[in-house]
Amino acid sequence: MALDKLLEHEAQAEIERIRAEARDRAQQILASARERADALLESRRRLLETQRQAALVRARSAADLELSAARLTASEQGMAEVYRLVEGHLREITGLPEYREILARLIAEARQAIPEAEAVEVNPADLALARELVTDLSVRENPAIQGGVRVVARGGKSGITNTLAGRLDRLRGELAPQVSRLLAE
């Protein structure tokens, strides 16, 4: 019977050893699974954080772009309004006493550009004034001319227009940054 007890005891010891190994192996598997799960969770968390940061950057960029577009639109509208006001004031200049001197300068500048002039064209409202200022050339009406003069070269095929509005148009590019800055203040 001692042999039975000895075999039983050895079998019980073997069972305990196998159980202990199984527990150790199960704990290792469990620890490894936890480690992989934690790594996967951390990886997903980093990915989500990266995506969140990218979404924030995109949202900020979109907002900045929208703000810039709104500012540009406001600036363009403001510039257009400024030029409308200036053009209105330029049209009013023709009714001021100083316009005689202004028209005389515009005529002189245009005639310098075309020394062989045939005629001077002005707005019908400026015809009498232009005839006082120009005595050596024909002075004709041209309703298309506003606030200035057109000097026609001999033969009538070419000419030069020198108007206040034309000068404003030529300076528009130079004035735009200054006007924008003033509107922004």
Swiss-Prot record:
The keyword Lipoprotein appears for this protein:
no
- Keywords of this entry: ATP synthesis, Hydrogen ion transport, Ion transport, Transport
Which example biological process does GO assign this protein?
proton motive force-driven plasma membrane ATP synthesis
Report one GO cellular component.
proton-transporting two-sector ATPase complex, catalytic domain
Pfam families, per database record: vATP-synt_E (PF01991)
The entry lists its GO molecular-function terms as: ATP binding; proton-transporting ATP synthase activity, rotational mechanism; proton-transporting ATPase activity, rotational mechanism
Q: Which InterPro entries match?
A: ATPase_E_C, ATPase_V1_Esu
- Give a yes or no for keyword Methyltransferase in this entry: no
Q: Which family does it belong to?
A: Belongs to the V-ATPase E subunit family.
Q: What does the record give as the function of this protein? A: Produces ATP from ADP in the presence of a proton gradient across the membrane.
Q: What is this protein called?
A: V-type ATP synthase subunit E
Q: Which organism is it from?
A: Deinococcus geothermalis (strain DSM 11300 / CIP 105573 / AG-3a)
**Where is the organism placed in the taxonomic lineage, from the top?**
Bacteria, Thermotogati, Deinococcota, Deinococci, Deinococcales
